[in-house]
UniProtKB/Swiss-Prot annotation:
Gene name of this polypeptide: Plin1
Source species: Mus musculus (Mouse)
Modified residues (Phosphothreonine): 85, 223, 298, 300
Protein name as annotated: Perilipin-1
Modification(s) after translation: Major cAMP-dependent protein kinase-substrate in adipocytes, also dephosphorylated by PP1. When phosphorylated, may be maximally sensitive to HSL and when unphosphorylated, may play a role in the inhibition of lipolysis, by acting as a barrier in lipid droplet.
Region called Disordered, residue ranges: 195-216, 286-320, 425-490
Length: 517
């Protein structure tokens, strides 16, 4: 009976006693943590049906294992019930002591987090204030001392300036400066015309407002400088505008300006194109030399192709330059000069852009870094450049000779041009003497010098009057009465013939004609 009553009493006493596990689970911190775990577990189960089935299987397994463990441990628990009761009481007392010492155990997690955040922020704020407040106070003191020193220095400077201005020398200097500035202002007002906008406005201000105090010297000087600069700019702009309008009335200036603009744009295009083409060939040439040492056969084939390409490029450039130099001369002296200047500018720009590549290629050839094709291409470009410059010089000379009349003696004409005068033809002699044949004495010898024209024309005195009376008496009247005829048309060997103004072909045109023939 005693054995049967024991468990009944034990079962009756358990609900009345406090359980440590229940109290721990009832704590807000523990309950909130359990709720978080439960929510996480439920969300994981709902993520996928397969996960939910696996979790349900594990739950059933754990539940069955716990039931089996409780059924197997029941006899042991009944025998050790007194010891478990004593341990439960001790645990409850310790839990009461912890709740008294740590009241945060009774708070929810949200309140604990907010209080923790507040305490951390207050600690950080206090630490920051402990560091920043001394620095701020020190900086304020330093700034205050600096400002006080600056104010003291400014005050001393003002007092010194006022004292110097109140002295006799200062008053004389200020009066002289005021007088000089006033005279300059009067001269400027007298010489410069008043502004259209400022004149009526100044009159209105005088009628409406009372006279103000006299401005300082610095303000007056700045106003005078602004007035002079503004008037200078206006005068310069007006002069430029008038000059432009007058220059446009001159015949030939408008096309010259358009040609200058076109030449500038063409020069910029040429410079940009040449800058894009010019490259620094050091690394490429070094790599090419290394490749040549490894593969000689492939290099020979590549050299042949490169030579052909370079020859084509050089021929194209020469054709372009020849076309530039072979352009027809425009009508008029101004057009010819402008055309020549444009051609010279183009060739100069091309020479300047080719010079770096030519110098680098020559240096690389000396240092055995560049192959022979680079030297040949550079040489070809140099030759084409020299030909272009020669063509330009020939064009300039032709233009000058064509439009500038030079004296006859300055042009070294050969003796062949005067042979027609020294040695007249038989038809001319027949016309001069009528139907009579010319006597052998009156015709000059083939080797006769230029001075023998006097004897032919009958201007020199006879050397032997006894012998020449018969011939002179018959020939002199008819020869003197004959008018001088113009010589036949001759082709001169010099640059131009003074009698007829005609353009002469340059070297580039002659070379093109030879090629075409």
């Amino acid at each position: 009976m005693s054995m049967n009553k024991g468990p009944t009493l034990l079962d009756g006493d358990l609900p009345e006693q406090e359980n440590v596990l229940q109290r721990v689970l009832q704590l807000p911190v523990v309950s909130g943590t359990c709720e978080c775990f439960q929510k996480t577990y439920n969300s994981t189960k709902e993520a996928h049906p397969l996960v939910a089935s696996v979790c349900n299987a594990y739950e059933k397994g754990v539940q069955g294992a716990s039931n089996l463990a409780a059924w197997s441990m029941e006899p042991v628990v009944r025998r050790l019930s007194t010891q478990f009761t004593a341990a439960n009481e001790l645990a409850c007392r310790g839990l009461d002591h912890l709740e008294e010492k740590i009241p945060a155990l009774q708070y929810p997690p949200e309140k604990i987090a907010s209080e923790l955040k507040g305490t951390i922020s207050t600690r950080l704020r206090s630490a920051r204030n402990s560091i920043s407040v001394p620095i701020a106070s020190t900086s304020d003191k330093v700034l205050g001392a600096t400002l006080a020193g600056c104010e003291l220095a400014l005050g001393m400077a003002k007092e010194t300036a006022e004292y110097a201005a109140n002295t006799r020398v200062g008053r004389l200097a200020s009066g002289g400066a005021d007088l000089a500035l006033g005279s300059i202002e009067k001269v400027v007002e007298f010489l410069l015309p008043p502004d259209k906008e400022s004149a009526p406005s100044s009159g209105r201000q005088r009628t409406q407002k009372a006279p103000k105090a006299k401005p300082s010297l610095v303000r007056r000087v700045s106003t005078l400088a602004n007035t002079l600069s503004r008037h200078t700019m206006q005068t310069t702009a007006w002069a430029l505008k008038q000059g432009h309008s007058l220059a446009m009335w001159i015949p030939g200036v408008a096309p010259l300006s358009s040609l200058a603009q076109w030449g500038a744009s063409a020069a910029m295009q040429v410079v940009s194109r040449r800058q894009s083409e010019v490259r620094v060939p050091w690394l490429h040439n070094l790599a090419a030399s290394q490749d040549e040492s490894h593969d000689d056969q492939t290099d020979t084939e590549g050299e042949e192709t490169d030579d052909e390409e370079e020859e084509e490029e050089s021929e194209a450039e020469e054709n372009v330059l020849r076309e530039v130099t072979a352009l027809p001369n425009p009508r008029g002296l101004l057009g010819g000069v402008v055309h020549t200047v444009q051609n010279t500018l183009r060739n100069t720009i091309s020479a300047v852009t080719w010079a770096p590549a030519a110098v680098l290629g020559t240096v690389g050839r000396i240092l055995h870094l560049t192959p022979a094709q680079a030297v040949s291409s550079t040489k070809g470009r140099a030759m084409s450049l020299s030909d272009a410059l020669k063509g330009v010089t020939d064009n300039v000379v032709d233009t000058v000779v064509h439009y500038v009349p030079l004296p006859r003696l300055s042009l070294m004409e050969p003796e062949s041009e005067f042979r027609d005068i020294d040695n007249p033809s038989a038809e001319a002699e027949r016309k001069g003497s009528g139907a009579r044949p010319a006597s052998p004495e009156s015709t000059p010898r083939p080797g006769q010098p230029r001075g023998s024209l006097r004897s032919v024309r009958g201007l020199s005195a006879p050397s032997c009057p006894g012998l020449d009376d018969k011939t002179e008496a018959s020939a002199r009247p008819g020869f003197l009465a004959m008018p001088r005829e113009k010589p036949a048309r001759r082709v001169s060997d010099s640059f131009f013939r003074p009698s007829v103004m005609e353009p002469i072909l340059g070297r580039a045109q002659y070379s093109q004609l030879r090629k075409k023939s």
